[in-house]
Amino acid sequence: MVILAIGGYDPTSGAGISADIKTAHTLGVYCPTITTSVIPQNNKMVYEKFDLPEENIKNQFKAVFEEFDIEYVKTGVLTKPAIDTLLKYIDKYDLKVICDPVLASTTKFSFVDEKLMEKYIELFNKSFLITPNKEEYKKIMEFIKNNNLMIRNDLYILATGIDDILMKNFKPIKTFKGFRVDKEVHGTGCVYSTAITAFLSKGYDLEEAIKEAKRFVLSSVIYAKKSKFGYNSNPTYINKEKVIKNLSYAIYLLKKMNFTLIPEVGSNIAESLPFPKDFKDVAALTGRIIKNKLGGFYIVGDIEFGASEHIAKIILSASKFNPEIRACMNIKYDGGLIKLLKDKFAVSSFDRKEEPPNVSTMEWGTKIACEKFGGVPDIIYDRGGEGKEPMIRVLGRDAIEVVKKVEVIQKIYNTLM
């Protein structure tokens, strides 16, 4: 698969064509690019917008279209020569354009004047989808109204925000729910629209492409890279296949260990998709990790989504405090071990005696432990209760990280023996 990205060059690689390339590569799609402008910027300010000359832009189009068969095009920051040239190529090659109308930077530097806005309207009328944020959508609609312009009715418009609204004939047809993440991340619009384009090129229908791209961009936000003045987008794709691969490798690592911290009820290990909604978004063993008579262990069952509501409830509760935490494993409790672990790990706990009636123990206990700690610790334990075995739960960003923590815990436990 090949998609073309047309837009500005951001030397910090947080946005623009650098972010487009990273996004497409992460999704397994090749992405040639056409640069319209060089925009020295960072999370503090835009220094300037230097537009490349028309002849250079035409030569970039010529080079790309001579080399590749292009069907899908994603656009970011555009100039008049870039739009004029693209319009000709749309007619010649019947291109499907996903236009992200970048009207201004997050630092409020304007990329568009009235004449260029008129050109954008011309491009919208030949696009398949436009993806303005809700502020940009409002400005576009006001400009159209004030200048007696028209946009064709069958254009798909995705007005983006926390929740995104897909429209056709200017009427909402689907809402894509999101989550508020307390980070101002540079480049999310680029990542989102490029991801939609990439999924469309893979054969997804529009609604499925948006749904998958939404999950992708949310992951890119929670794993965003911190720099001096803010956060830069970090294209990250965690789908069901990735979760199952992580769990499979984590179990492989576990098999190589002399793992003895197995509770009487057995252990299980789980990992979720980003922002899990319910236990169906969490994969785990359909069985358990259980002791054998030779001092080793058996791994019973397969890895499947929705396999364990019990351990899923821990992840579902913890992810509300920190969405990066997506994995958990339960292991044997030992009071002496807990004392030693407090020197190496962040540890919190809950007391089953304080559990209110009619609640899920795991959801309530995880919430209490996280509130006590002020975030998600590495370890949450409880000392059990009537008919309930005491337990240690190890949490982490993925199943591999969890097993590596368990390996350290096992070594510490071995010193007690």
UniProtKB/Swiss-Prot annotation:
Cited SUPFAM superfamilies: AraD/HMP-PK domain-like, Ribokinase-like
Gene Ontology cellular component terms for the protein in this record: cytosol
Entry-linked Gene3D superfamilies: 3.40.1190.20, Class II aldolase/adducin N-terminal domain
UniProt-listed InterPro entries: Aldolase_II/adducin_N_sf, HMP/HMP-P_kinase_dom, PM/HMP-P_kinase-1, Ribokinase-like, ThiN
Annotated GO MF terms: ATP binding; hydroxymethylpyrimidine kinase activity; phosphomethylpyrimidine kinase activity; thiamine-phosphate diphosphorylase activity
Pathways involved: Cofactor biosynthesis; thiamine diphosphate biosynthesis; 4-amino-2-methyl-5-diphosphomethylpyrimidine from 5-amino-1-(5-phospho-D-ribosyl)imidazole; Cofactor biosynthesis; thiamine diphosphate biosynthesis; thiamine phosphate from 4-amino-2-methyl-5-diphosphomethylpyrimidine and 4-methyl-5-(2-phosphoethyl)-thiazole: step 1/1
Enzyme Commission number(s) of this protein: 2.7.1.49, 2.7.4.7, 2.5.1.3
Region (Thiamine-phosphate synthase): 236-417
Keywords: ATP-binding, Kinase, Multifunctional enzyme, Nucleotide-binding, Thiamine biosynthesis, Transferase
Keyword Cell membrane: no
PANTHER family per the UniProt record, alphabetical: HYDROXYMETHYLPYRIMIDINE_PHOSPHOMETHYLPYRIMIDINE KINASE THI20-RELATED, PHOSPHOMETHYLPYRIMIDINE KINASE
Role: Catalyzes the phosphorylation of hydroxymethylpyrimidine phosphate (HMP-P) to HMP-PP, and of HMP to HMP-P.
Family that this chain belongs to: In the N-terminal section; belongs to the ThiD family.
UniProt protein name: Bifunctional thiamine biosynthesis protein ThiDN
Organism: Methanocaldococcus jannaschii (strain ATCC 43067 / DSM 2661 / JAL-1 / JCM 10045 / NBRC 100440)
